[in-house]
Amino acid sequence: MSWAAPDDIFFSTSLAAYLDKKLLVLLRDGRKLMGLLRSFDQFANAVLEEAYERVIVGDLYCDIPLGLYIIRGENVVLIGELDVEKEELPAHMVQVPEAEIKRAQKAEKEEMLLKGTMRKRMEFLDLD
């Protein structure tokens, strides 16, 4: 059995200040989760209640409900408290249904892939 290093323990105890507060959690894979922190352990594993994933593509966004959600600590990049009195998003953002945001994500991914292949084709030009 391995024990947590002292640095791990200090990191997770600082999460105690966030208990029962609305948080934004950024994961290694780029997903953004929001919810109420209900529990955590010495490895920064966390339990979010009323969790949802916020997907943003351009000026479109969608909140996908997840319910009670367990996050493995090693996947967390950033945790921050959200100000419940402040507006979460700029006024120009438009909320869309989940199906539409998935289509927008797919189109954005294909566009990025196309840009990458075009860059590779033009490498011989040495534009840098």
Curated annotation (Swiss-Prot):
Coiled coil: none annotated. Disruption phenotype: No visible phenotype under normal growth conditions, but the double mutants lsm1a and lsm1b show severe developmental alterations, such as delayed seed germination, reduced root length, epinastic, chlorotic and small cotyledons, small and serrated leaves, abnormal venation in cotyledons and leaves, dwarf plants with early flowering, short siliques with reduced seed number and small morphologically alterated seeds. Residues 10-85 form the Sm domain. The keyword Protease does not apply. GO terms for molecular function: RNA binding. GO terms for cellular component: Lsm1-7-Pat1 complex; P-body; ribonucleoprotein complex. InterPro entries: Lsm1 (IPR034104), LSM_dom_sf (IPR010920), PTHR15588 (IPR044642), Sm (IPR047575), Sm_dom_euk/arc (IPR001163). SUPFAM superfamilies: Sm-like ribonucleoproteins. SMART domains: Sm. The keyword RNA-binding applies. It holds the Pfam family LSM. It is found in: Cytoplasm; Cytoplasm, P-body. Its main location: cytoplasm. Keywords: Cytoplasm, mRNA processing, Ribonucleoprotein, RNA-binding. GO terms for biological process: cold acclimation; deadenylation-dependent decapping of nuclear-transcribed mRNA; hyperosmotic salinity response; mRNA processing; response to water deprivation; RNA metabolic process. Expressed in roots, leaves, stems, flowers and siliques. Component of the heptameric LSM1-LSM7 complex that forms a seven-membered ring structure with a donut shape. The LSM subunits are arranged in the order LSM1, LSM2, LSM3, LSM6, LSM5, LSM7 and LSM4. LSM1A subunit interacts only with its two neighboring subunits, LSM2 and LSM4. Component of the cytoplasmic LSM1-LSM7 complex which is involved in mRNA degradation by promoting decapping and leading to accurate 5'-3' mRNA decay. LSM1A and LSM1B are essential for the formation of the cytoplasmic LSM1-LSM7 complex which regulates developmental gene expression by the decapping of specific development-related transcripts. Required for P-body formation during heat stress. Belongs to the snRNP Sm proteins family. This is Sm-like protein LSM1A. It comes from Arabidopsis thaliana. The gene is LSM1A.
